[in-house]
Amino acid sequence: INLVNIVFIKLLEVYMIPVDDKSQFGSYEANQVVALIIKITRSLGSKWISKRLIFILRRIAIYFSKQCLDTVLFDSNLRLYTKGNVSEKRALFSPQIFEEEERNFIASRASDNSIFIDIGANVGLYSFSVSQKYKLFENTKIFALEPHPDLFKRLLFNQNLNSHLPIFPKRIAIMHKPGEFFLNTPKENLGQGKISQKGELKVEGLPLSNFAEIEGIKKISAIKIDVEGNEEKVLLPFIIEENRSLF
């Protein structure tokens, strides 16, 4: 094995972090240095200089961190991983600049019987961020849909930590047609997976209208979709006149 291969293997070991969904919450408590950095980065603003400072401090904190951290975020107990998923790192250290306007809009749609569908949920950050508002109303549901097996395990673990919230994880890929597809994911960012006809991970795909029928959904209050450039292909078959009653 030459030097290049050794370096490549070491990099994969950094990114391929096993999912710990067995240990109790609190097992990965931040040490004093990391806790202080998180407190600082979460208090900073959204201007360029603040973002640069957050980036620098985040790198320092990750260096001194374990593979994941147990934290309170969005008024929920969450276990977030420090490597291999950009979304988790951003939310962990700087939730104030984590698409706040979009999350506030989705939260504003909450009322009795509201349904929010989080397509490409990753570890459920959008779902958890709005769930505190949705739980205030009767018969609300947040469907967090994520096909990647490791991300889904993390999502399910966090949902179990917060079982009082109306979040319902489903391991499924919303697609333009039903069937089995493949998910190709870069090891350095699990949240960047793309659906294709061949690849590493086989996932089940289902059109949004089919999913709504299976779950007995009559009206959708809000949808968030992040499927790495496949958004139009997924949504256009759904936005037709015969589905008008759903939205």
List the model feature ranges, each with a label.
Residues N5-F247:
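Phosphate/nucleotide-binding beta-alpha loop and adjacent structural elements of enzyme active sites
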